[in-house]
């Protein structure tokens, strides 16, 4: 039986009582530079039919309403002047005051039953579908631990490359790119350890193996494969537009269908925007985690790339709490953000055959990526644009999301896959 690190186990055991925020530090969501930054910070309690031991802690897949989060948060009322000026000047122009005890308050957040992506019914529909196709999902992120027992069977393989012979067998300019490429170090070393937790976590949400004792991915390894494209690295998960552009081109050249982008920048290049606009892939993008105080803002007014790009091949995702509200840190936008998906206290894979909770729009985007891959695999007669339409046309409407997202709702995988059959 796989075992979680001791600290994670103790967190799991306390889930039905009180949740405390993940100890992992939040990375800045938007930087005043051209570099990309990751969108994460930082746990459902009913076992899924997949038969995975830790699936009972995946509230995003089956929310029974038994969770509570207790935390200290910023008291918005004490910061009203920030919001009054924000729309005019942008966050970089605001002189923020020092924060003291009076700026914070303790609050409880209780889960609401059925605020989840409705995956069980979707799996049933998927299992009844014949003639599925294999879908390749490119994850442009930090690296991914391809040896993780919950991921190893879901990793894409370049069949034209002979592993370890030091020769560029397929002549594509990348030597021994068996599972993807590291565009940070220009090598085939696609996992270097702890710094690749972010990408590994997203990979587990999308396609962790079913019925093997770990967690359950939205899809499984039979018909969905993950292409590992490391374009961000270092302790803060930074990367250049040039690296991401090269990764996009690699993904296209090697047959990727869907691309997950859980990062962003407030100052991207025209070349980067064109790379997405001109691609045939469907991009699922994280909306971003707000300002330096982790308070989300309107990206219709203060755009973030690629989340604010108005292209037909982009789906932008906000971070939904287990009570049906956007997380305070999640960016929003009645035009730019298409829908919300669970992104707070998401349990998934990390390097070293381990598991951890993370929170942020980086965790929400892979939920939609996994859903898109599942539906696209099931419906061989539909285009990727059809899949986007299905997902956005069938959201679970939630009053708190009205005016915050274009659809006013959250991801409903079952409704989306059934919609495609009508």
Regions found by a protein language model. Name each.
Residues 27-136, 144-150, 421:
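Protease zymogen maturation seam
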Residues 29-36, 44, 110, 120-240, ...:
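Subtilisin-like serine protease catalytic core
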Residues 16-26:
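C-terminal segment of classical bacterial N-terminal signal peptides
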Residues 37, 216, 254-261, 313-316, ...:
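C-terminal subdomain of the subtilisin-like protease fold in secreted/lumenal serine endopeptidases
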Residues 320:
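Carbohydrate-associated surface elements
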Residues 363-380:
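Short, small-residue alpha-helix embedded
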Residues 124, 129-131, 142, 196-197, ...:
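Substrate-binding/access-modulating region of protease and related hydrolase catalytic domains
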Residues 3-16:
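Sec-dependent N-terminal signal peptides
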């Amino acid at each position: 039986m796989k075992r979680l690190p001791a600290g994670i186990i103790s967190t799991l055991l306390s889930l039905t009582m009180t949740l405390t925020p993940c100890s992992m530090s939040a990375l800045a969501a938007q930087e005043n530079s051209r570099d990309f930054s990751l969108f994460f910070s930082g746990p459902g309690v009913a076992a899924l039919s997949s038969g995975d031991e830790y699936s009972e802690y995946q509230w995003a897949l089956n929310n029974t309403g038994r969770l509570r989060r207790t935390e200290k948060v910023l008291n918005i009322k004490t910061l009203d002047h920030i919001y009054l000026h924000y729309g005019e000047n942008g966050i970089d122009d605001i002189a923020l005051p020092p924060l003291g005890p009076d700026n914070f308050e303790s609050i409880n957040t209780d889960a609401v039953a059925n605020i989840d992506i409705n995956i069980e019914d979707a799996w049933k529909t998927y299992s009844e579908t014949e003639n599925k196709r294999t879908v390749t999902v490119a994850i442009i992120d930090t690296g991914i631990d391809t040896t993780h027992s919950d991921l190893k069977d879901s990793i894409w393989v370049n069949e034209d490359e002979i592993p370890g012979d030091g020769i560029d067998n397929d002549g594509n300019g990348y030597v021994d790119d068996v599972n993807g490429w590291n565009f940070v170090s220009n090598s085939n070393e696609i996992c270097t350890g702890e710094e690749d937790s972010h990408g590994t976590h997203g990979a587990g949400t999308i396609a962790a193996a079913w019925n093997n004792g770990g967690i359950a991915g939205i899809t499984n390894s039979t018909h969905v494969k993950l292409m590992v494209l490391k374009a961000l690295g270092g302790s803060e998960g930074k990367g250049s537009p040039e690296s991401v552009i090269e990764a996009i081109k690699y993904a296209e050249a090697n047959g990727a269908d869907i691309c997950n982008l859980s990062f962003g920048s407030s100052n991207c290049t025209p070349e980067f925007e064109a790379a997405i606009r001109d691609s045939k892939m469907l991009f699922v993008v994280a909306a971003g985690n707000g300002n330096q105080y982790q308070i989300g803002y309107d990206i219709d007014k203060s755009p973030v790339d690629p989340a604010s790009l108005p292209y037909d091949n982009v789906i932008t995702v906000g971070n939904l709490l287990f009570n049906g509200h956007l997380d305070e840190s999640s960016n929003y936008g009645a035009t730019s953000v298409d829908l919300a998906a669970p992104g707070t206290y998401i349990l998934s894979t990390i390097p070293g055959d381990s598991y951890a909770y993370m929170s942020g729009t980086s965790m929400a985007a892979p939920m939609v990526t996994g859903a898109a891959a599942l539906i696209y695999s099931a419906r061989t007669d539909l285009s990727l644009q059809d899949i986007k339409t299905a997902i956005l046309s069938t959201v679970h409407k939630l009053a708190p999301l009205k005016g915050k997202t274009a659809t006013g709702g959250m991801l409903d995988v079952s409704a989306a896959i059934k919609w495609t059959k009508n």
